[in-house]
């Protein structure tokens, strides 16, 4: 599920980055400047970052070729998150990838008055974080994927698909 979320985030990022290039006809000469803010070192968050970058690479955007990455980890400190996000915003990066809710909130707040797109992943409730309106539509310059596990809906689907199942397990 985390890898799928990271992959979907990368696809969204790719579509945003296409619009971030210069006005040149040859977009292959563009080098994108990407800032990545990760809230903490954690296996699932690390996988989100790796999946995001792998998704970009599958679309031809690769570090060292046409992508410059500035990666920062706030070590679970929201004040550090805010500083990183402000720094990224002042550098006018092409895009910010924010991993986990606190990092996404910091990036969103730092870029509200700019056109820097923010793509988040590992955000449990985009609505509660203020990234979508009451209809579920993105607000401002931010989009991404949620890591919310809807176990009740998953179990309902399993029951529909396998009504005779007696033992069901969900890996998370």
Give the location of each predicted region.
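C-terminal motif of bacterial Sec signal peptides marking the signal peptidase cleavage site
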Residues: 15-19
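Glycine-rich phosphate/adenylate-binding loop
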Residues: 1
């Amino acid at each position: 599920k985390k890898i799928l979320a990271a992959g979907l985030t990368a696809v969204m990022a790719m579509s945003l980055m296409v619009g971030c290039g210069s006005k040149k006809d040859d977009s292959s000469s563009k080098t994108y400047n990407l800032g990545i803010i990760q809230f903490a070192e954690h296996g699932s968050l690390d996988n989100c970052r790796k999946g995001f970058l792998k998704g970009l690479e599958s679309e031809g955007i690769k570090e060292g070729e046409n992508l410059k990455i500035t990666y920062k980890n706030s070590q679970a400190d929201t004040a550090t998150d805010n500083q990183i996000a402000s720094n990224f915003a002042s550098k006018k990066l092409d895009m910010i990838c924010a991993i986990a809710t606190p990092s996404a909130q910091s990036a969103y707040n730092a870029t509200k008055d700019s056109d820097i797109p923010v793509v988040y992943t590992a955000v449990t409730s985009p609505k509660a974080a203020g990234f979508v309106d009451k209809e579920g539509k993105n607000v401002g310059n931010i989009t991404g994927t949620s890591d919310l596990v809807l176990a009740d809906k998953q179990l309902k689907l399993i029951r529909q698909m396998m009504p005779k199942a007696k033992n069901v397990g969900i890996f998370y």
